[in-house]
Amino acid sequence: MLRKAIADIEAKYLRTDLPEMRAGDSVRVHTKIKEGDKERIQVFEGVVIAYRKGAPGSSMFTVRKVSYGVGVERMFPVHSPRIDKIEVVGHGGVRRSRLYFLRNLQGKAARLHQEEGPGAADAAHAAPTPA
């Protein structure tokens, strides 16, 4: 009975606008940052290297990017109110659920093969076409 009451309370705070994503996807996470009395949106773009699904309120995903030659990883709670939106930019073709091996790779070796899909098509149109 107590578990049902807790589940009912948690259900109000769960996000319903989540895109379909998995490890290997390139994502753009828009987070709300509070600086003093102002609030702004900061974008963190990278590859999902882990997606931990657990109880509805405890799901998390880890995004990795390389910034100025330094690898940066950030963990996000899926249902966090600090996340404004999550955009899937492309789908990477991987056969693993945890891509921790990317930490040891550099340059072209760290790239993932991009699969064709709705997110990948949008990214392809954004790139300039060679003349």
From Swiss-Prot:
One of its GO terms (biological process) is translation. Coiled coil: none annotated. GO terms for molecular function: structural constituent of ribosome. GO terms for cellular component: cytosolic large ribosomal subunit. PANTHER family: LARGE RIBOSOMAL SUBUNIT PROTEIN BL19M, RIBOSOMAL PROTEIN L19. The gene is rplS. InterPro entries: Ribosomal_bL19, Ribosomal_bL19_sf, Translation_prot_SH3-like_sf. This is Large ribosomal subunit protein bL19. It comes from Anaeromyxobacter dehalogenans (strain 2CP-C). Keywords: Ribonucleoprotein, Ribosomal protein.
